[in-house]
Structures are given as C-alpha cells and as structure tokens.
C-alpha cells in the first residue's frame, strides 16, 4: 500500500486532545487495509517524528434504520492511536 494513502485524516476529539497532553498520543483515521507497520512508516515520513507504538481500533459498519426498516449502511473504519517518542510533537495538533 502507498504510504501517502494510509493516513486519511486526523481525529480531533476531547479524548484525543486529552491523550495528546497526557500520553504523547495522536489519533488518525487510517485506510482499512493498513497495518501497524505501514501506519508507523507513514506518520514518521509525513511528520518527521519517531513513533514508539501504534494501537489500532476497528469500527464495525452499522445499519441505518428508519421506522424499523433498514435504509442503508454506514461504512466501517479504522482508527490508529500513535504514541510518539518523548519530546516529539506534530505541529498540526499543537494549536488544539
């Protein structure tokens, strides 16, 4: 998989902001076929930081219902929590 297509977008929520401050972690929405090694390489190349660990969470697809009938589906996606080396920062997340 191309390194440029691994990271889809950063996740900015209350939880990820707290993790950034307390545990030196940032979160990204990543391609569903990406593995931990590809995510690590993509973050290190894109932001010029060292990654210590990558934790991955998959969100299952959900059925959209209206009045008891299935109308459609929300697609599943994959989230990666990336732990950075002590002292490294990603400038994109610093103003949040």
Swiss-Prot record:
Query: Taxonomically, which superkingdom?
Result: Bacteria
CC terms in the record's Gene Ontology section? ribonucleoprotein complex; ribosome
Which biological processes are named by the entry's GO terms? translation
Gene Ontology MF annotations: rRNA binding; structural constituent of ribosome
Ordered alphabetically, the record's keywords are: Ribonucleoprotein, Ribosomal protein, RNA-binding, rRNA-binding
Q: Which InterPro entries match?
A: Nucleotide-bd_a/b_plait_sf, Ribosomal_uL23-like, Ribosomal_uL23/eL15/eS24_sf
Family according to the record = Belongs to the universal ribosomal protein uL23 family.
Q: Which NCBIfam families match?
A: PRK05738.1-3 (NF004359), PRK05738.2-4 (NF004363)
Q: How does it assemble?
A: Part of the 50S ribosomal subunit. Contacts protein L29, and trigger factor when it is bound to the ribosome.
Q: What does this protein do?
A: One of the early assembly proteins it binds 23S rRNA. One of the proteins that surrounds the polypeptide exit tunnel on the outside of the ribosome. Forms the main docking site for trigger factor binding to the ribosome.
Q: What is this protein called?
A: Large ribosomal subunit protein uL23
């Amino acid at each position: 998989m191309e390194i440029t297509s691994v990271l889809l977008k950063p996740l900015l929520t209350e939880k990820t902001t707290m993790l950034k401050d307390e545990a030196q972690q940032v979160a990204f929405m990543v391609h569903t076929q990406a593995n931990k090694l590809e995510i690590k390489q993509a973050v290190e190349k894109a932001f010029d930081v060292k990654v210590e660990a990558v934790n991955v969470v998959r969100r299952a697809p959900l059925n959209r219902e209206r009045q008891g009938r299935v109308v459609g589906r929300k697609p599943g996606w994959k989230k990666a929590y990336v732990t950075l080396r002590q002292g490294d920062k990603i400038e994109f997340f610093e103003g949040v």
